[in-house]
């Protein structure tokens, strides 16, 4: 019996996706005008919770006109936000409240309201209200608007990217036929070539399997150099960030950004990076030596020699490591068809957290007037609590296929709050609506969408963001989100479930068992391989395979942490220069390539006489553009926290519904209503420790409690 009945939206109307380019602009201008009026009268809360919803289309809509209009709306919001939070009159009123710390006005505030006022005060200060001289405040505001426009332009360039590389037929050796069949045939002088897009679903399997080193290098360099127009924009962004931080009285941008986060200082970040880099360095050196040995052996079998491993070799030789692992990898994706995997994952989450995800079909969507999805392939879910009283928790959207448009968003994109949650004036809750957009290759009539292990892990990770956003319940919309250096922890914790044998097996399901059409697709692939009357594949992975898979990620973990250390190190170097003059003299491209080589102990084009500017990978570093500036270390800190949370709550029994509900209530539900360090210590019962993380790096999960994380309190 369906405990929920047929009503999807009895509790709250979901958002509508019926915008037009003109309506977006009108809605944005109306929202800004209403907000300004509210501030002018100071009689109501700031109603900006729809801002993310209106800019949602810029990275999801198949309509270029709507994407462009949404980008323009983003500029309107950016400028309006700067104007609002640089208003001295409102700042003076907020400041007055905090100056009365021991008086009645503050005493009447609950803890969440006081915390909100404190964060609001810091936001005003960081938007120029702390600058005494009027002329400098005007300068600051102008530069902040310019900075916002530059970031939006870089993102637009990335979203509209159509870059790729032409590959001749002789360069395709090793690349899977399933990928080759999807590539566009050239004409004219490229009539005997195929176009390989640089977007991840195409370039990743190509560079992982191409046998020719020259081909791998071409693909890698095309990826690194696809955003040449962003080179000067990125430089101006870095310089403007530094300049505006100094106008506010900070030593640099990193000092400004960390002041309002868990780590509080760049020095604390640098200490964390140093500890992790020291721990991972010997493991990385061993990893590189193992891969180089594989390259040498392969070269010897071809009658050539190889003395060095390059960046474009890493994915290829990592995939070649170990014949047993290689055999597993070649067929493992057949057990992770996209839609089936997603459904099974949601089922695990339903059990663990006491919830129900009800897919809303076309008939169900007719219950509400208007467009409830932005594309016909989008899936919509109403989310309910079923552990106790039935309770509507909000609406989720899932778009997992490659978007039907030329521009390409990143491989995954969580729009965490198309609508943020908050408490209405009558005490009722306005519930969040969230969206997950995954840029997987779309299925065809002859081939389903099958996920690699990395893609399945990524799916678990992004759904972790979705749950955190969806289940947070705060009094104020502004406190819905957590600090940037905590935001990755809940998602990374959820990843750990996929490396537990039971969950890998539960999620696995060979696509030939889904339905007869899928079975025919699978049989067709065997005909191509000259197999006749093959035995049926088992429906689920065997215990032996699952056992190996649960332990096969150690080398990938090391390379993954190297990537995070590199990006976090580069992020801090550009945002914490020795001086303004040093930053102005800095070659950001050269620094990017030198830092990467130093961290990985692997070289790129500079080893072949191409100099240190052979690739400008900093221009495709999306995170540093989008709210992770001077905050990329959050991925490492998030992993540290995630391992500690997993060990404390789920290590002994990952299927415990009691543990899941405790986690949902103490972490997900809390959101940003209190200091994130308090959330961590309340849940753990102790200060966070790096020991579970370091043990994970070493491939062990036992030992003493280890040192605590060097986070100021």
From Swiss-Prot:
Instruction: Return the GO cellular component terms, semicolon-separated.
Output: mitochondrial intermembrane space
Keyword line: Hydrolase, Metal-binding, Metalloprotease, Protease, Virulence, Zinc
Checking Pfam families in the record gives:
Peptidase_M3
- Establish whether keyword Hydrolase is in the entry: yes
For the protein in the UniProt heading, the enzyme class is hydrolase
**Pathway(s) per entry:** Mycotoxin biosynthesis
Entry-linked CDD domains: M3A_TOP
Q: What residues make up the catalytic site?
A: 462
The record's listing under SUPFAM superfamilies reads: Metalloproteases ('zincins'), catalytic domain
Amino-acid positions noted as binding Zn(2+) in the UniProt annotation, renumbered to this chain: 461, 465, 468
The record, for Gene3D superfamilies, names: Collagenase (Catalytic Domain), Endopeptidase. Chain P, domain 1, Neurolysin, domain 3
- Cofactors that this protein relies on: Zn(2+)
Query: Has UniProt tagged this entry with the keyword Hydrolase?
Result: yes
EC number(s) recorded for this UniProt protein: 3.4.24.-
Q: From which domain of life does this come?
A: Eukaryota
For this entry, list what GO says about its biological process: peptide metabolic process; proteolysis
Task: Give one GO term, molecular function aspect.
Answer: metal ion binding
Provide the cofactor note recorded for this chain's UniProt entry.
Binds 1 zinc ion per subunit.
* Quaternary organization: Monomer.
Function statement: Oligopeptidase; part of the gene cluster that mediates the biosynthesis of the phomopsins, a group of hexapeptide mycotoxins which infects lupins and causes lupinosis disease in livestock. Within the pathway, phomG and phomG' are probably involved in the processing of the phomA and phomA' precursors. The pathway starts with the processing of the precursor phomA by several endopeptidases including kexin proteases as well as the cluster-specific S41 family peptidase phomP1 and the oligopeptidase phomG to produce 10 identical copies of the hexapeptide Tyr-Val-Ile-Pro-Ile-Asp.
Q: Which family does it belong to?
A: Belongs to the peptidase M3 family.
Query: What is this protein called in UniProt?
Result: Oligopeptidase PhomG
Source organism (scientific name): Diaporthe leptostromiformis (Lupinosis disease fungus)
Lineage per the UniProt record: Eukaryota, Fungi, Dikarya, Ascomycota, Pezizomycotina
Gene that encodes the chain: phomG
